[in-house]
Regions:
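Conserved glycine-rich "GG(E/T)P / GGGxP" loop and the immediately following alpha-helix
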Residues: 1-151
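Short charge-dense sequence patches
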Residues: 45-52, 173-183
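Short hydrophobic/aromatic beta-strand element in the GNAT-like acyltransferase core
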Residues: 192
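Short, acidic, Ser/Thr-enriched surface-loop or helix-capping motifs
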Residues: 195-196
Length: 223
């Protein structure tokens, strides 16, 4: 989505929301001009939420990542062992931990949410999580006990001021070809909508393929 079209969407959305989630499917940090998009959000007095795999943190300066428009950064740590990468675990975690340290050193007001969405009854990611929890425990002087977390299933644990680690089960993107729909609910059209890069308006971010097209945002006013 080019900047001109993005600004037109933000301008039209202003009467309806105060927050913009800068992704539907994908990683907003792959955009080299992310700062320009954040400038537009800030221009209209809105807040941005960035959700990233963590792989592209080093592509951006802290002036961008801590842009005054950014309300929170969500980092999906479980993406490390679900993607082919030449990075070692330590190389992957280094910019994540550096970001957290810089947030504290600079007294930035945004939230950093570290997501660990890979918990299951079989503890299939036990080895990865054990290493991850040891790393986070050491970095933040907070004990993250693997067995306790699996047993008690906390939603989140505070690591430091506005830095939290969040836990959940595996997330699977919905598909019409999937026979198991599960029991989840969606707040699409109640609390939010999504706009794809093509301009299609859909009920929520789960409809990344535009199956339920409500409007073509390029030609139809947002209202």
């Amino acid at each position: 989505m080019d900047l001109h079209f993005f600004e037109s969407i933000i301008q039209q959305a202003k009467p309806y929301t105060k927050e913009i989630a800068c992704h539907v499917l994908g990683d907003p940090l792959t955009q080299s001009n992310l700062h320009d998009y954040l400038d537009i959000i800030h221009k209209y007095g809105m807040k941005a939420m960035l959700t990233t795999s963590g792989y592209f943190l080093k592509k951006h300066s802290y002036d961008t990542l801590f842009h005054p428009a950014v309300k929170q950064i969500n980092i999906s740590l479980n993406s490390f062992n679900k993607n082919d990468t030449s990075l070692t675990f330590d190389q992957y975690m280094a910019p994540v931990l550096s970001l957290c340290k810089a947030k504290l050193d600079r007294n930035e007001d945004l939230f950093i949410n570290l997501r660990v969405w890979n918990l299951d009854e079989m503890m299939s990611e036990r080895l990865f999580n054990e290493r991850l929890f040891l790393t986070l425990s050491s970095a933040f002087d907070v004990k993250l006990d693997l067995d306790t977390i699996y047993h008690e299933k906390p939603k989140s644990i505070r690591l430091d001021s506005k830095i939290l680690v969040h836990f959940d089960n595996y997330f699977e993107w919905p598909s019409l070809s999937n026979k198991n729909y599960g029991d989840g609910t969606c707040q699409g059209l109640q609390s939010h909508i999504a706009i794809l890069a093509s301009g299609k308006v859909v009920p929520c971010c789960l409809d990344c393929d535009g199956v339920i097209e409500l409007a073509e945002g390029i030609h139809v006013p947002f209202s």
